[in-house]
Design a protein with these regions (language model features):
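Proteolytic processing junctions in secreted/extracellular precursors
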Residues: 4-6, 10, 81
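Short aromatic-glycine-(Arg/Gly/Cys) micro-motifs in beta-strand/loop hairpins
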Residues: 12-30, 52-55
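Short, mixed-charge low-complexity intrinsically disordered segments
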Residues: 49-110
Length: 110
């Protein structure tokens, strides 16, 4: 099975919602942006159990950005570790092609 980071890095030039289940059984959603160099930026936990288009847009407005030229992938891996993303609690990556519309598909990598 490909790692979550590898799966995200293969999806070029997309916004994603990364959905995980926390240890207290709550769903947490993280926003991720990729480009042709792989993962570019991501946001901390901002919303849960809500796929409303306005909420999706707010994730990116509140997102914490990191430079891909300054060890970003290491930072992203540490981020995934810090929220304890594993194959057991990783739900889906939802591509968001248009910030004004809902995700048009859901990809499962586990």
């Amino acid at each position: 099975m490909k790692s979550i980071v590898e799966s995200i890095n293969e999806a070029k030039n997309f916004f994603f919602a990364l959905v995980v289940k926390s240890s207290d059984d709550k769903v947490k959603i993280f926003s991720v942006k990729t480009n042709y160099n792989g993962v570019e930026d991501f946001a901390s936990d901002i919303a849960a159990n809500d796929d409303d288009a306005d909420t999706i847009e707010s994730w990116f407005k509140a997102g914490v950005q990191y430079s891909r030229y300054d060890g970003f992938n290491d930072k992203f891996k540490k981020f995934l570790e810090s929220v304890k993303v594993t194959k057991d609690n990783f739900y889906t990556i939802m591509p968001i092609q248009n910030m004004k519309t809902r995700p048009n598909a859901v990809y499962n990598f586990n």
